[in-house]
């Protein structure tokens, strides 16, 4: 205990983050199947909120030191403006820290203003932290060069730099945050992509699939946006509409009215859904499946449908039989790989089950939320013609774009993996939490499948 008291606040925050992370791993391994579902849901969310806030506290201490503490010895430290500045910074950090807790209490048909403000501050927090690090690194490099050249940096110059660094970081953060909010507020771009498909039946040439992903209904995305997405999809007149995961961030009962516009989708050959990692974070997948089915959106729970030019028929994965029509494609969907990590009962990526009855002599299209799942699927079944994924958001905001690019085998857009194999990763139709898009653009993808010899 004495050693803990001697630790700095930053070290204590780091220790807290490690402790919460270990508890998350332990609870996933030992409590996932023994706890009642509602209790498990609350435990998982509470652990996530505490873990994120422990990490945020480390950054908050750095932001406070850079923008407030380092300026306390400046001539303006006793001014009313500086006292007001301290209140503004404190409120900004408090809002950023409260963002993840809005998942508990502030989810409804439409976003609450507080949730939008809190998540906007979280986005600005990430941008500011990045630029403070960059400017600090530049300052350290300058001081090193000055020392090596024998130049002495005066106290007045040091004071100016202490003021200049946070001023620049705040200015850049403000500009980029406003740009990101305005970008995210725009309707998603409609991107048309033509994909050559080997063995595509002649009767299904120019088949149109509209791809949605990562809508994230929850604290900052509600019914109004969902209605807009549905209208945009219907204008495209798709043959098939697919939603490749992360539709929601809360329970089905809470978001029932927000997701209701999906029932107005018009797709000649049906609308289909596969889970993303966030569906499992809600711990309410069964209720989401039932709700989507009532809206005429068919979940593909490690199963497939055989689709011809005129009809769709449930295929393998435990139900139904094959289509009698020879001119068909196999549209399969797998559970998100996060279900295995969370030990979510009855769920987990099962490619063999999903592709049961899908002949290599026919076109195979797979829905798999994460690009990592797409990579694993292609390693096991290289005969898959097209995989549709999401998850990355194309990074959503700078500088997270860099991390998303490095952590995923496929980042965004169309990839030709082999002569007859393609992967398309959607950058997302909305956004997760933070109502910003910086260095990325939300998208509704119109995929035109073209017959290839």
UniProtKB/Swiss-Prot annotation:
<dbReference type="InterPro" id="IPR029052">
    <property type="entry name" value="Metallo-depent_PP-like"/>
</dbReference>
<feature type="transmembrane region" description="Helical">
    <location>
        <begin position="87"/>
        <end position="107"/>
    </location>
</feature>
<dbReference type="GO" id="GO:0016787">
    <property type="term" value="F:hydrolase activity"/>
</dbReference>
<feature type="binding site">
    <location>
        <position position="246"/>
    </location>
    <ligand>
        <name>a divalent metal cation 2</name>
    </ligand>
</feature>
<dbReference type="GO" id="GO:0016020">
    <property type="term" value="C:membrane"/>
</dbReference>
<comment type="similarity">
    <text>Belongs to the metallophosphoesterase superfamily. LOC643853 family.</text>
</comment>
<feature type="transmembrane region" description="Helical">
    <location>
        <begin position="43"/>
        <end position="63"/>
    </location>
</feature>
<dbReference type="GO" id="GO:0046872">
    <property type="term" value="F:metal ion binding"/>
</dbReference>
<keyword id="KW-0472">Membrane</keyword>
<feature type="binding site">
    <location>
        <position position="277"/>
    </location>
    <ligand>
        <name>a divalent metal cation 2</name>
    </ligand>
</feature>
<dbReference type="Pfam" id="PF00149">
    <property type="entry name" value="Metallophos"/>
</dbReference>
<feature type="binding site">
    <location>
        <position position="391"/>
    </location>
    <ligand>
        <name>a divalent metal cation 2</name>
    </ligand>
</feature>
<feature type="binding site">
    <location>
        <position position="214"/>
    </location>
    <ligand>
        <name>a divalent metal cation 1</name>
    </ligand>
</feature>
<feature type="transmembrane region" description="Helical">
    <location>
        <begin position="7"/>
        <end position="27"/>
    </location>
</feature>
<keyword id="KW-0812">Transmembrane</keyword>
<keyword id="KW-0479">Metal-binding</keyword>
<keyword id="KW-1133">Transmembrane helix</keyword>
<keyword id="KW-0378">Hydrolase</keyword>
<dbReference type="InterPro" id="IPR004843">
    <property type="entry name" value="Calcineurin-like_PHP_ApaH"/>
</dbReference>
<feature type="binding site">
    <location>
        <position position="246"/>
    </location>
    <ligand>
        <name>a divalent metal cation 1</name>
    </ligand>
</feature>
<feature type="binding site">
    <location>
        <position position="393"/>
    </location>
    <ligand>
        <name>a divalent metal cation 1</name>
    </ligand>
</feature>
<dbReference type="InterPro" id="IPR051158">
    <property type="entry name" value="Metallophosphoesterase_sf"/>
</dbReference>
<feature type="transmembrane region" description="Helical">
    <location>
        <begin position="114"/>
        <end position="134"/>
    </location>
</feature>
<feature type="binding site">
    <location>
        <position position="216"/>
    </location>
    <ligand>
        <name>a divalent metal cation 1</name>
    </ligand>
</feature>
<protein>
    <recommendedName>
        <fullName>Transmembrane protein with metallophosphoesterase domain</fullName>
        <ecNumber>3.1.-.-</ecNumber>
    </recommendedName>
</protein>
<feature type="transmembrane region" description="Helical">
    <location>
        <begin position="162"/>
        <end position="182"/>
    </location>
</feature>
């Amino acid at each position: 205990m004495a050693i803990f008291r001697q630790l700095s606040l930053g070290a204590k925050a780091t220790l807290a983050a490690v402790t919460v992370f270990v508890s998350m791993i332990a609870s996933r391994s030992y409590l996932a199947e023994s706890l009642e579902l509602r209790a498990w849901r609350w435990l998982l969310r509470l652990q996530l909120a505490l873990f994120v806030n422990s990490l945020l506290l480390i950054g908050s201490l750095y932001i406070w030191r850079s923008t407030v503490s380092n300026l306390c010895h400046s001539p303006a430290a006793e001014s009313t403006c500086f006292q007001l500045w301290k209140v503004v910074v404190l409120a900004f950090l408090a809002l950023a820290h409260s963002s993840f807790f809005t998942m508990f209490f502030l989810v409804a048909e439409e976003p609450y203003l507080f949730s939008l403000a809190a998540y906007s501050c979280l986005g600005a927090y990430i941008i500011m932290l990045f630029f403070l690090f960059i400017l600090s690194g530049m300052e350290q490099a300058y001081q090193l060069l000055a020392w090596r050249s024998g130049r002495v940096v005066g106290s007045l110059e040091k004071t100016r730099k202490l003021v200049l660094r946070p001023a620049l970081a705040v200015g850049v953060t403000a500009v980029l945050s406003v740009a990101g909010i305005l970008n995210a507020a725009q309707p998603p771009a409609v991107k048309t992509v033509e994909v050559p498909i080997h063995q595509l039946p002649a009767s299904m040439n120019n088949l149109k699939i509209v791809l949605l992903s990562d809508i994230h209904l929850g604290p900052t995305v509600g019914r109004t946006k969902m209605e807009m997405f549905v209208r945009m999809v219907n204008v495209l007149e798709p043959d098939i509409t697919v939603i490749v995961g992360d539709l929601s961030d809360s329970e089905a009962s809470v978001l029932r009215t927000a997701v209701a516009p999906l029932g107005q989708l018009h797709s000649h050959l049906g609308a289909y859904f596969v889970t993303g990692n966030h569906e499992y974070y809600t711990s309410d997948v069964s209720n989401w499946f039932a709700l989507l089915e009532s809206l005429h959106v068919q979940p593909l729970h490690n199963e497939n449908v055989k689709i011809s030019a005129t009809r769709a028929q449930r295929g393998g994965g435990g139900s139904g039989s094959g289509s009698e029509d020879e001119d068909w494609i196999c549209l399969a969907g797998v559970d998100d790989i996060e279900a295995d990590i969370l030990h979510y009962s009855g769920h987990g990526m099962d490619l063999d089950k999903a592709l049961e009855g899908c002949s290599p002599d026919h076109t195979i299209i797979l829905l798999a939320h994460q690009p990592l799942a797409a990579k694993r699927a292609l390693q096991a079944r290289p005969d898959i013609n097209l995989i549709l994924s999401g998850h990355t958001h194309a990074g959503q905001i700078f500088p997270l774009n860099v991390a998303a690019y490095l952590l995923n085998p496929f980042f965004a857009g169309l990839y030709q993996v082999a002569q007859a194999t393609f992967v398309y990763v959607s950058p997302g139709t909305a956004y997760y939490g933070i109502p910003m898009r910086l260095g990325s653009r939300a998208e509704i993808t119109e995929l035109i499948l073209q017959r290839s010899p």
